[in-house]
């Protein structure tokens, strides 16, 4: 009986916190412009960069060079964000960037009160209705149910203008980075919660050896023979990661957790077909839109796998890769 009560009581939580050092190093890597892939957001760069003076460019160039020189640049960022200055490169970046802290202070002052409010809002969220679904996802990925653990979120400075929430989950990190929107309403709160669970899903995916095996087999079977090119700004590794994470939680297609996150059923392909076809008629969709649309096509199979307790395999990705291939031909 006691064990049953413990199982019922055991839940998970995501705790938001504010850390100026984490926010500073996120701002620093953005204005250094070391990465211009899909992760780069020009409007955010413009806002963050407004406080930079010409004399600062040498420091930014040095920071960019150090990050780019590492075989695993995101590991350097993980250490900087987490306050782990245990290697030469992270210590060097921390040292040479010290003069820029005063520049960052004006950005920090703009958003500090806003982040305080978002921290309280996020820490009021409950995840009791998601716990069992997340455990099912863990099993699907070949993980133990105990993989569903509490997580820490570091809040990052948002743009002052209208913007959408964005998150990051670096592999091997024990935290999530979240940049909330500046404004508040129920719709924004829902969007933030979805982004948080999307990034939480990335954390589970990063732990899954079965995901790596399924993605590799799918890549060797469906991508290599046709020499398919990944959507602009993405590698195929990142595409496979995003396909699965969007299937779990997405502001665009809902995902497996949509009923718990929004109280609404997941949109179907037919529900979204007309809007996507209109988009195609106007212009070429962005890489993010392509991946979301492709992900929607694998959602029914993923849902069946999860509900039936099946393990992830390469077949999960077939519907999505087929869509990407068809869009390439069109």
Where are these regions (language model features)?
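Post-HEXXH active-site segment of zinc metalloproteases
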Residues: 207-237
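Active-site recognition of the HExxH zinc-binding catalytic motif
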Residues: 190-211
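Pan-zinc metallopeptidase signature
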Residues: 249-253, 257-330
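N-terminal low-structure segments adjacent to metalloprotease catalytic domains
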Residues: 1-106
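An active-site-proximal "capping" alpha-helix that borders the catalytic cofactor pocket
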Residues: 137-140, 239-254
């Amino acid at each position: 009986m006691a064990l049953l009560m413990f199982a019922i009581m055991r839940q998970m939580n995501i705790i938001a916190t504010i850390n100026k050092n984490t926010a500073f190093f996120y701002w620093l890597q953005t204005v250094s412009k070391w990465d211009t892939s899909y992760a780069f957001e020009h409007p955010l760069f413009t806002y963050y960069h407004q406080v930079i003076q010409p004399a600062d460019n040498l420091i930014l160039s040095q920071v960019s060079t150090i990050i780019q020189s590492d075989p695993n640049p995101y590991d350097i960022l993980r250490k900087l964000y987490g306050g782990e200055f245990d290697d030469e490169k992270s210590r060097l970046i921390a040292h040479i960037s010290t003069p820029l802290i005063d520049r960052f202070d004006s950005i920090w002052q703009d958003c500090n009160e806003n982040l305080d409010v978002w921290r309280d809002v996020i820490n009021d969220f409950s995840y009791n209705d998601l716990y069992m679904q997340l455990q099912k996802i863990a099993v699907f990925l070949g993980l133990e149910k105990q993989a569903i653990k509490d997580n820490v979120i570091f809040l990052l400075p948002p743009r002052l203008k209208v913007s959408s929430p964005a998150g990051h989950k670096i592999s091997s990190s024990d935290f999530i980075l979240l940049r909330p929107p500046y404004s508040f309403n129920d719709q924004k709160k829902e969007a933030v919660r979805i982004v948080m669970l999307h990034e939480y899903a990335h954390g589970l995916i990063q732990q899954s050896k079965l995901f790596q095996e399924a993605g590799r087999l799918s890549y060797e079977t469906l991508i290599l023979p046709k020499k398919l090119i990944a959507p602009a700004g993405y590698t195929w590794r990142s595409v496979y990661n995003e396909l699965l994470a969007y299937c779990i939680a997405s502001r665009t297609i809902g995902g497996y957790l949509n009923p718990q996150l929004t109280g609404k059923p997941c949109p179907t392909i037919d529900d979204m077909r007309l809007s996507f076809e209109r988009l195609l008629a106007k212009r070429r969709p962005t890489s993010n839109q392509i991946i979301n649309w492709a992900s929607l096509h694998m959602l029914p199979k993923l849902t069946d796998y999860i509900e039936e307790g099946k393990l992830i395999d390469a077949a999960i990705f077939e519907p999505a890769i087929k869509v990407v291939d068809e869009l390439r031909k069109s």
